[in-house]
Amino acid sequence: MKTKLRKNDEVIVIAGSYKGTKGTILKVLPKQQRVQVKGVNVVTKHVKPSQSNSEGSIQNFEAPIHISNVAYVHKSGPKDKSGIASKISYEKRKDKKVRIARKTGKVI
């Protein structure tokens, strides 16, 4: 399934235990329909010692969440701190395909 969200887009979580949390997309996994969002769904992984890693460690990282649980946040200007949750559409302008925030109608 094609996704309209991209890396470094600002999103808000709209469902789940992190509902209302804002963050930026670190990674998009289109085949699994998931995204990794900074500061959301942080899990702890215990790494065993190995030849390459002589000491074991405990690492925290963001696990991916389903793409339907996030919404794009469109900021109208540099002073706009909160932004508006909006869907994304595409339009052709001057032989280029551009992303547009549906609520504001502005190019992303």
Curated annotation (Swiss-Prot):
Molecular-function annotations in GO: rRNA binding; structural constituent of ribosome
Keywords: Ribonucleoprotein, Ribosomal protein, RNA-binding, rRNA-binding
GO CC, alphabetical: ribonucleoprotein complex; ribosome
GO biological process: translation
Stored InterPro entries: KOW, Rib_uL2_dom2, Ribosomal_uL24, Ribosomal_uL24_CS, Ribosomal_uL24_KOW, Translation_prot_SH3-like_sf
Record-linked SMART domains: KOW (SM00739)
Tagged with keyword NAD: no
Superkingdom of the organism of origin: Bacteria
PROSITE patterns: RIBOSOMAL_L24 (PS01108)
One Pfam family cited in the UniProt record for this chain: ribosomal_L24
Subunit structure: Part of the 50S ribosomal subunit.
Family: Belongs to the universal ribosomal protein uL24 family.
HAMAP family documented for this protein: Ribosomal_uL24_B
Role description: One of two assembly initiator proteins, it binds directly to the 5'-end of the 23S rRNA, where it nucleates assembly of the 50S subunit. One of the proteins that surrounds the polypeptide exit tunnel on the outside of the subunit.
Protein name (Swiss-Prot/TrEMBL): Large ribosomal subunit protein uL24
Organism: Mycoplasmopsis pulmonis (strain UAB CTIP) (Mycoplasma pulmonis)
